[in-house]
Amino acid sequence: MPPCPPQQNRNRLSQLPVGELGEMELTWQEIMSITELQGLNVPSETSFEPQAPTPYPGPLPPPTYCPCSIHPDAGFSLPPPSYELPASTPHVPELPYSYGNVAIPVSKPLTLSGLLNEPLPDHLALLDIGLPVGQPKPQEDPESDSGLSLNYSDAESLELEGMEAGRRRSEYVDMYPVEYPYSLMPNSLAHPNYTLPPTETPLALESSSGPVRAKPAVRGEAGSRDERRALAMKIPFPTDKIVNLPVDDFNELLAQYPLTESQLALVRDIRRRGKNKVAAQNCRKRKLETIVQLERELERLSSERERLLRARGEADRTLEVMRQQLAELYHDIFQHLRDESGNSYSPEEYVLQQAADGAIFLVPRGTKMEATD
């Protein structure tokens, strides 16, 4: 059994005798019968620790309890453990074990009049009831056969025996709105159920692969249909000859066998559709060959374009180098040229021009030298 949770705002009292415990239990049963007759929705809790249950037909292991105490002035601070009592309780025998340091002060005896005059617990005070901090423990089932539950009171077990469990359970929840430190929904979300994807994946694969596998059957359906029709019409030669023979051989084949009009019509229909099928296959083959040739030509043109772009870049670089060399040559030539006064010519005012015979002349800019024979 897990350790008893720590009790807050309670004092440790002396031990309760067994005789007084049985008398208090009978008194409490009388109080509950009175409240049920009056239809009062009062909290079914006691101010003392669990009562002694009557022995069950089978042997019960002696439970061990940690020392817990009750403060009589606190007014039903925590619900006591629940014990399911049998239908008839003629007497309460003494127990071979004790409940630890659980007691009721002697100076304040419990009587029927005192319990009736005692004020009922405040509902707002019940909201301060907290659960023990730590790992959350699973909640006990209110309909369980266990009599050692620490989360339910004796009154709840008596109500479940005497009246409808659903109505009493809803009233109990309204009277005691206890907030749990954890929620049940995260636990359900933490372990989702992945059952649909395994069943949907094979179906999706089968649906996608079904038409692909059925294509060979569709392709051979025409041939099998022609063969069945030829067998039904009792054609004396196979369908392969009807389709593949040249025109002359096909006419000779028809002349060898006496065929009716319906048989001739069927043979010509089979040959026509077979030739159309062969022509369609040849057309598709030619289209594929043309596509392959165009792809190869496109690759060749792409490589040629790249080669021409590289050549153009090299030509541009060579032209830029030649322009730089020409500018340097102009500068050197104009540095060596002098007029009659010994002054140098400016490249901004004069330019060098070459005649048809190869002679070079220095002329001012903006003037053209006339061609001489």
Curated annotation (Swiss-Prot):
- Record GO terms (molecular function): DNA-binding transcription factor activity; RNA polymerase II cis-regulatory region sequence-specific DNA binding; WW domain binding
Q: How is it modified after translation?
A: Phosphorylated on serine residues. In undifferentiated erythrocytes, phosphorylated by MAPK8 which then leads to ubiquitination and protein degradation.
Where Phosphoserine occurs along the chain?
A: S157, S170
Write out the ranges of the annotated region (Basic motif): 268-287
| Any single GO BP term | cell-cell signaling
Keywords, alphabetical: Activator, Cytoplasm, DNA-binding, Isopeptide bond, Nucleus, Phosphoprotein, Transcription, Transcription regulation, Ubl conjugation
Q: Which family does it belong to?
A: Belongs to the bZIP family. CNC subfamily.
Protein name, as recorded: Transcription factor NF-E2 45 kDa subunit
Q: Which organism is it from?
A: Mus musculus (Mouse)
Name the lineage: Eukaryota, Metazoa, Chordata, Craniata, Vertebrata
